[in-house]
Amino acid sequence: MNNYNMNPSLFQNYTWNNIINSSNNNNKNDDHHHQHNNDPIGMAMDQYTQLHIFNPFSSSHFPPLSSSLTTTTLLSGDQEDDEDEEEPLEELGAMKEMMYKIAAMQSVDIDPATVKKPKRRNVRISDDPQSVAARHRRERISERIRILQRLVPGGTKMDTASMLDEAIRYVKFLKRQIRLLNNNTGYTPPPPQDQASQAVTTSWVSPPPPPSFGRGGRGVGELI
């Protein structure tokens, strides 16, 4: 009977030692895992390995989105520039072309004093220097706009935005007319010369004046 009885103190010591050993092993594993987590270089290397080696769809296999967008934007910008350079000439109607030709024969010397100014409303005018300078600048712009309205065919009956569009078309028409006239006549103006070269050319072309003798002098026959 005594052989089958176990000492309680021995059983308790055995159990307690097993618990301590298992706890120590767990602590060692936790310490190793904690040290690995506290190492940022090791964590970064692990993430890089997982992303760039084991992930076939990583960013190394595909170009970045920003570079693709930049390339697309540059290509589209070049295409827009080519379209602007190759813009076809706008065809004008017969009525508008005749109106442009009539306007081109009118005088372009417009006195700003003859242009009617709009009526100013009764508002208080500030004496601040910045306000005065801004008001003068707006008045100069308005004066140039009114003169341009007189130069553009039908510009006095349009608002400012429509008149500016019409001015662009009118300038293009005038440039085409100048190009056509130059092609038809075939005349190319000579390059401008400075005054010194022009004086040298004139002296070589025109002969010197003949000598003049007074009353008491002898004639050319007597000299011979």
UniProtKB/Swiss-Prot annotation:
Chain intervals with Polar residues compositional bias: 194-204
Q: What is its main location?
A: nucleus
Locate the compositionally biased regions of type Acidic residues. Answer: 78-88
Which cell locations does it reside in? Nucleus
- Determine if Nucleus is one of this entry's keywords: yes
Disulphide-bridged cysteine pairs: none
Positions with biased composition (Low complexity)? 68-77
Q: Where is the composition biased (Basic and acidic residues)?
A: 28-37
- General function of this protein: Required for the female reproductive tract development and fertility.
User: What protein is this chain from?
Assistant: Transcription factor HEC3
What is the species of this protein? Arabidopsis thaliana (Mouse-ear cress)
Organism lineage reads as: Eukaryota, Viridiplantae, Streptophyta, Embryophyta, Tracheophyta
